[in-house]
Amino acid sequence: MMNNKIGCILLNIGTPDQPTVPSIRKYLKEFLSDPDVIDSSKIIRWMIVNLIVSPFRPKRILHQYESIWTKDGSPLLANSKEFSLNLSRLLPEFNIEIGMRYGNPSILKAVKNLKNLGINDILLIPMFPQYAQATSGSCIQAAKEIIKEEIPACKIKVIEKFYSEDFYIKCLVEKILNSSEYKECEYLLFSFHGLPERQIKRLDKSRQHCLVKNKCCEEICDSNINCYKAHCTQTVNKVVEQLKPSVEYSICFQSRFGLDKWISPNITDVMVSLSNKGIKKVAVACPSFTFDCLETLEEIAIRNNETFVEELNGEYLKLIPSLNNENYWVKNFSEFIKRSI
Protein backbone atom coordinates (compact mmCIF):
# COMPACT_ATOMS: atom_id res chain seq x y z
CA MET A 1 0.00 0.00 0.00
CA MET A 2 1.33 3.41 -0.97
CA ASN A 3 2.08 5.83 1.86
CA ASN A 4 1.49 9.54 1.22
CA LYS A 5 4.15 10.48 3.72
CA ILE A 6 7.66 11.40 2.58
CA GLY A 7 10.61 9.37 3.77
CA CYS A 8 13.61 11.25 5.09
CA ILE A 9 16.96 9.60 5.82
CA LEU A 10 19.45 11.51 7.96
CA LEU A 11 22.81 10.24 6.74
CA ASN A 12 26.00 10.12 8.77
CA ILE A 13 29.33 8.31 8.80
CA GLY A 14 28.67 5.96 11.71
CA THR A 15 30.19 4.62 14.89
CA PRO A 16 31.33 1.32 16.40
CA ASP A 17 28.56 -0.59 18.17
CA GLN A 18 30.60 -0.92 21.35
CA PRO A 19 33.85 0.49 22.80
CA THR A 20 35.63 -2.84 22.26
CA VAL A 21 38.54 -3.87 20.05
CA PRO A 22 36.46 -6.26 17.85
CA SER A 23 33.72 -3.66 17.36
CA ILE A 24 36.19 -0.87 16.55
CA ARG A 25 38.09 -3.15 14.17
CA LYS A 26 34.89 -4.09 12.33
CA TYR A 27 33.90 -0.44 12.00
CA LEU A 28 37.32 0.74 10.83
CA LYS A 29 37.58 -2.01 8.21
CA GLU A 30 34.23 -1.02 6.73
CA PHE A 31 34.97 2.71 6.95
CA LEU A 32 38.49 2.64 5.52
CA SER A 33 37.64 0.14 2.77
CA ASP A 34 35.49 2.81 1.12
CA PRO A 35 37.39 4.14 -1.95
CA ASP A 36 35.98 7.60 -1.25
CA VAL A 37 37.78 7.61 2.11
CA ILE A 38 41.11 6.07 1.14
CA ASP A 39 41.24 6.96 -2.53
CA SER A 40 44.32 4.91 -3.40
CA SER A 41 44.42 1.87 -5.67
CA LYS A 42 42.46 -1.17 -4.51
CA ILE A 43 45.57 -3.15 -3.57
CA ILE A 44 47.16 -0.27 -1.63
CA ARG A 45 43.88 0.39 0.17
CA TRP A 46 43.61 -3.31 1.09
CA MET A 47 47.17 -3.30 2.45
CA ILE A 48 46.59 -0.15 4.51
CA VAL A 49 43.36 -1.48 6.00
CA ASN A 50 44.32 -5.10 6.59
CA LEU A 51 48.06 -4.94 7.28
CA ILE A 52 48.50 -1.56 8.97
CA VAL A 53 45.24 -0.28 10.47
CA SER A 54 43.18 -3.31 11.39
CA PRO A 55 45.81 -5.27 13.37
CA PHE A 56 47.02 -2.34 15.49
CA ARG A 57 44.84 0.78 15.49
CA PRO A 58 41.76 -0.63 17.32
CA LYS A 59 43.84 -1.34 20.45
CA ARG A 60 45.55 2.05 20.23
CA ILE A 61 42.31 4.03 20.09
CA LEU A 62 40.17 1.85 22.39
CA HIS A 63 40.73 4.23 25.32
CA GLN A 64 39.55 7.13 23.17
CA TYR A 65 36.15 5.53 22.63
CA GLU A 66 35.98 4.42 26.27
CA SER A 67 36.56 8.00 27.40
CA ILE A 68 33.45 9.34 25.59
CA TRP A 69 31.04 6.38 25.80
CA THR A 70 27.89 7.05 27.80
CA LYS A 71 25.11 5.00 29.38
CA ASP A 72 23.20 5.63 26.14
CA GLY A 73 26.11 4.33 24.06
CA SER A 74 27.91 6.22 21.32
CA PRO A 75 27.33 10.00 21.67
CA LEU A 76 27.00 10.33 17.89
CA LEU A 77 24.28 7.70 17.71
CA ALA A 78 22.52 8.83 20.90
CA ASN A 79 22.41 12.43 19.67
CA SER A 80 21.26 11.30 16.22
CA LYS A 81 18.40 9.29 17.71
CA GLU A 82 17.24 12.14 19.92
CA PHE A 83 17.46 14.60 17.02
CA SER A 84 15.48 12.26 14.77
CA LEU A 85 12.80 11.78 17.43
CA ASN A 86 12.46 15.52 18.07
CA LEU A 87 12.38 16.22 14.34
CA SER A 88 9.63 13.63 13.85
CA ARG A 89 7.43 15.42 16.37
CA LEU A 90 7.67 18.60 14.30
CA LEU A 91 7.27 16.84 10.95
CA PRO A 92 4.33 14.42 11.20
CA GLU A 93 4.09 14.35 7.40
CA PHE A 94 7.52 12.67 7.24
CA ASN A 95 8.84 9.26 8.24
CA ILE A 96 12.35 9.99 9.48
CA GLU A 97 15.10 7.39 9.66
CA ILE A 98 18.79 7.40 10.56
CA GLY A 99 21.16 5.82 8.05
CA MET A 100 24.82 5.30 8.91
CA ARG A 101 27.24 4.79 6.02
CA TYR A 102 29.21 2.32 8.15
CA GLY A 103 27.95 0.42 11.17
CA ASN A 104 24.44 0.58 12.61
CA PRO A 105 21.70 1.54 12.02
CA SER A 106 22.66 1.06 8.39
CA ILE A 107 21.35 2.89 5.34
CA LEU A 108 19.96 -0.44 4.13
CA LYS A 109 17.93 -0.81 7.34
CA ALA A 110 16.60 2.74 6.97
CA VAL A 111 15.53 2.11 3.37
CA LYS A 112 13.88 -1.21 4.24
CA ASN A 113 11.95 0.45 7.06
CA LEU A 114 10.61 3.04 4.62
CA LYS A 115 9.90 0.35 2.03
CA ASN A 116 7.82 -1.60 4.54
CA LEU A 117 5.78 1.55 5.17
CA GLY A 118 5.02 1.90 1.47
CA ILE A 119 7.10 5.05 1.05
CA ASN A 120 7.78 6.08 -2.56
CA ASP A 121 9.36 9.50 -2.02
CA ILE A 122 12.62 9.80 -0.08
CA LEU A 123 14.64 12.86 0.91
CA LEU A 124 18.32 12.22 1.62
CA ILE A 125 20.10 14.63 3.96
CA PRO A 126 23.76 14.07 4.87
CA MET A 127 24.27 15.70 8.27
CA PHE A 128 27.45 17.34 7.00
CA PRO A 129 26.95 21.05 6.28
CA GLN A 130 30.06 21.25 4.08
CA TYR A 131 30.24 18.89 1.10
CA ALA A 132 33.05 16.37 0.73
CA GLN A 133 33.10 13.29 -1.46
CA ALA A 134 34.46 11.23 1.44
CA THR A 135 31.43 12.05 3.61
CA SER A 136 28.33 13.49 1.90
CA GLY A 137 29.25 12.12 -1.52
CA SER A 138 29.84 8.58 -0.29
CA CYS A 139 26.65 8.57 1.81
CA ILE A 140 24.51 9.86 -1.05
CA GLN A 141 25.91 7.42 -3.58
CA ALA A 142 25.43 4.44 -1.26
CA ALA A 143 21.88 5.50 -0.36
CA LYS A 144 20.86 5.99 -4.00
CA GLU A 145 22.16 2.55 -4.96
CA ILE A 146 20.31 0.88 -2.09
CA ILE A 147 17.05 2.74 -2.82
CA LYS A 148 17.18 1.82 -6.51
CA GLU A 149 17.63 -1.82 -5.52
CA GLU A 150 14.94 -1.88 -2.81
CA ILE A 151 12.36 0.63 -4.17
CA PRO A 152 13.02 0.95 -7.94
CA ALA A 153 10.19 3.43 -8.59
CA CYS A 154 11.08 5.67 -5.64
CA LYS A 155 11.53 9.39 -6.22
CA ILE A 156 14.74 10.62 -4.61
CA LYS A 157 15.60 14.16 -3.59
CA VAL A 158 18.96 15.12 -2.11
CA ILE A 159 20.16 18.01 0.00
CA GLU A 160 23.90 17.89 -0.64
CA LYS A 161 25.02 20.74 1.62
CA PHE A 162 23.82 23.59 3.79
CA TYR A 163 27.08 25.30 4.79
CA SER A 164 25.82 28.81 4.01
CA GLU A 165 22.11 28.48 4.75
CA ASP A 166 20.86 31.27 7.01
CA PHE A 167 19.22 28.88 9.50
CA TYR A 168 22.47 26.96 10.00
CA ILE A 169 24.58 30.09 10.41
CA LYS A 170 22.12 31.62 12.88
CA CYS A 171 22.08 28.43 14.95
CA LEU A 172 25.88 28.33 15.07
CA VAL A 173 26.01 31.97 16.13
CA GLU A 174 23.45 31.38 18.88
CA LYS A 175 25.31 28.31 20.14
CA ILE A 176 28.63 30.14 20.30
CA LEU A 177 27.23 33.34 21.83
CA ASN A 178 25.46 31.46 24.62
CA SER A 179 28.39 29.22 25.50
CA SER A 180 30.46 29.85 28.62
CA GLU A 181 33.48 28.61 26.66
CA TYR A 182 33.22 31.57 24.28
CA LYS A 183 32.34 34.12 26.96
CA GLU A 184 35.48 33.29 28.96
CA CYS A 185 38.03 32.73 26.17
CA GLU A 186 40.85 34.88 24.78
CA TYR A 187 40.73 33.29 21.33
CA LEU A 188 38.09 31.53 19.21
CA LEU A 189 39.17 28.68 16.98
CA PHE A 190 36.95 27.22 14.25
CA SER A 191 38.09 23.63 13.73
CA PHE A 192 36.86 21.50 10.82
CA HIS A 193 37.61 17.90 9.96
CA GLY A 194 40.54 17.84 7.56
CA LEU A 195 40.93 16.20 4.15
CA PRO A 196 43.89 15.25 1.94
CA GLU A 197 44.67 18.03 -0.53
CA ARG A 198 44.23 15.71 -3.51
CA GLN A 199 40.56 15.18 -2.60
CA ILE A 200 40.06 18.94 -2.72
CA LYS A 201 41.83 19.31 -6.06
CA ARG A 202 39.95 16.41 -7.63
CA LEU A 203 36.61 18.22 -7.44
CA ASP A 204 38.03 21.31 -9.16
CA LYS A 205 37.10 20.64 -12.79
CA SER A 206 39.24 23.54 -14.00
CA ARG A 207 42.32 22.12 -12.21
CA GLN A 208 43.48 25.73 -11.97
CA HIS A 209 41.68 27.13 -8.93
CA CYS A 210 41.53 25.08 -5.72
CA LEU A 211 44.78 25.30 -3.74
CA VAL A 212 46.35 26.95 -6.80
CA LYS A 213 45.03 30.51 -6.81
CA ASN A 214 45.71 32.90 -3.96
CA LYS A 215 42.68 33.21 -1.65
CA CYS A 216 40.95 30.49 -3.69
CA CYS A 217 38.32 29.92 -0.98
CA GLU A 218 37.18 33.49 -0.39
CA GLU A 219 34.40 33.42 -2.98
CA ILE A 220 32.33 30.56 -4.40
CA CYS A 221 32.65 30.11 -8.17
CA ASP A 222 32.17 27.32 -10.73
CA SER A 223 35.58 25.85 -9.94
CA ASN A 224 35.12 25.54 -6.17
CA ILE A 225 31.35 25.04 -5.94
CA ASN A 226 31.93 21.62 -4.34
CA CYS A 227 35.18 22.48 -2.57
CA TYR A 228 35.10 21.44 1.08
CA LYS A 229 37.69 24.00 2.18
CA ALA A 230 35.82 26.79 0.40
CA HIS A 231 32.62 25.71 2.15
CA CYS A 232 34.38 25.78 5.53
CA THR A 233 35.76 29.24 4.79
CA GLN A 234 32.35 30.55 3.77
CA THR A 235 30.75 29.12 6.92
CA VAL A 236 33.26 30.92 9.12
CA ASN A 237 32.94 34.17 7.17
CA LYS A 238 29.16 34.16 7.56
CA VAL A 239 29.29 33.21 11.25
CA VAL A 240 31.81 35.94 12.01
CA GLU A 241 29.73 38.50 10.12
CA GLN A 242 26.84 37.88 12.51
CA LEU A 243 28.80 36.96 15.63
CA LYS A 244 31.09 40.01 15.56
CA PRO A 245 33.50 38.19 17.90
CA SER A 246 34.96 40.10 20.81
CA VAL A 247 38.22 38.12 20.52
CA GLU A 248 40.58 37.12 17.73
CA TYR A 249 39.65 34.03 15.72
CA SER A 250 40.97 31.74 12.99
CA ILE A 251 40.15 28.56 11.09
CA CYS A 252 41.99 25.24 11.28
CA PHE A 253 41.61 21.57 10.39
CA GLN A 254 41.88 18.47 12.56
CA SER A 255 41.92 14.65 12.51
CA ARG A 256 44.83 14.28 10.09
CA PHE A 257 46.18 10.76 9.61
CA GLY A 258 48.52 9.03 7.16
CA LEU A 259 51.41 10.50 5.20
CA ASP A 260 49.52 12.50 2.57
CA LYS A 261 49.51 16.29 2.56
CA TRP A 262 46.29 17.56 4.14
CA ILE A 263 44.63 20.95 3.97
CA SER A 264 46.02 23.48 6.40
CA PRO A 265 46.48 24.99 8.88
CA ASN A 266 46.44 21.93 11.10
CA ILE A 267 45.14 22.44 14.62
CA THR A 268 48.36 21.25 16.26
CA ASP A 269 50.36 23.92 14.42
CA VAL A 270 47.80 26.57 15.37
CA MET A 271 47.97 25.58 19.04
CA VAL A 272 51.75 26.05 18.99
CA SER A 273 51.34 29.45 17.34
CA LEU A 274 48.76 30.55 19.94
CA SER A 275 51.05 29.41 22.74
CA ASN A 276 53.94 31.40 21.27
CA LYS A 277 51.70 34.49 21.29
CA GLY A 278 50.97 34.01 24.98
CA ILE A 279 47.32 33.06 24.50
CA LYS A 280 46.16 30.89 27.40
CA LYS A 281 42.39 30.45 27.03
CA VAL A 282 41.03 29.02 23.78
CA ALA A 283 37.47 28.09 22.82
CA VAL A 284 36.97 25.72 19.89
CA ALA A 285 33.84 25.54 17.74
CA CYS A 286 33.56 22.60 15.33
CA PRO A 287 30.99 23.60 12.66
CA SER A 288 31.49 20.52 10.48
CA PHE A 289 30.12 18.30 13.25
CA THR A 290 26.39 18.75 13.81
CA PHE A 291 26.55 16.10 16.54
CA ASP A 292 29.31 15.66 19.09
CA CYS A 293 31.39 12.55 18.48
CA LEU A 294 34.89 11.12 18.92
CA GLU A 295 36.49 13.98 16.98
CA THR A 296 34.98 16.66 19.20
CA LEU A 297 34.59 15.02 22.61
CA GLU A 298 37.90 13.16 22.65
CA GLU A 299 40.21 14.73 20.08
CA ILE A 300 39.41 18.36 20.94
CA ALA A 301 38.02 18.36 24.48
CA ILE A 302 40.44 15.80 25.93
CA ARG A 303 43.52 15.17 23.80
CA ASN A 304 44.13 18.64 22.37
CA ASN A 305 43.27 20.28 25.67
CA GLU A 306 45.85 18.09 27.42
CA THR A 307 48.46 18.99 24.80
CA PHE A 308 47.71 22.71 25.07
CA VAL A 309 47.85 22.70 28.88
CA GLU A 310 50.63 20.19 29.58
CA GLU A 311 52.97 20.83 26.65
CA LEU A 312 52.20 24.37 25.48
CA ASN A 313 51.69 26.15 28.81
CA GLY A 314 48.06 27.05 28.09
CA GLU A 315 45.35 27.36 30.72
CA TYR A 316 42.70 25.53 28.69
CA LEU A 317 41.42 24.68 25.25
CA LYS A 318 37.67 24.12 25.64
CA LEU A 319 35.18 22.63 23.21
CA ILE A 320 32.02 24.57 22.42
CA PRO A 321 29.49 21.70 22.11
CA SER A 322 27.96 20.93 18.73
CA LEU A 323 24.37 21.87 17.92
CA ASN A 324 23.23 18.36 18.87
CA ASN A 325 19.59 18.67 20.00
CA GLU A 326 19.21 22.33 20.81
CA ASN A 327 15.53 23.25 20.41
CA TYR A 328 16.25 26.13 18.05
CA TRP A 329 18.41 23.84 15.89
CA VAL A 330 15.73 21.13 15.62
CA LYS A 331 13.03 23.71 14.86
CA ASN A 332 15.08 25.50 12.21
CA PHE A 333 16.15 22.22 10.64
CA SER A 334 12.52 21.06 10.43
CA GLU A 335 11.59 24.28 8.64
CA PHE A 336 14.55 23.82 6.29
CA ILE A 337 13.25 20.36 5.37
CA LYS A 338 9.78 21.75 4.66
CA ARG A 339 11.23 24.42 2.38
CA SER A 340 13.27 21.82 0.52
CA ILE A 341 10.32 19.74 -0.65
How does the language model describe each region?
Residues 2-341:
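Active-site-proximal alpha-helix that buttresses catalytic centers in soluble enzyme cores
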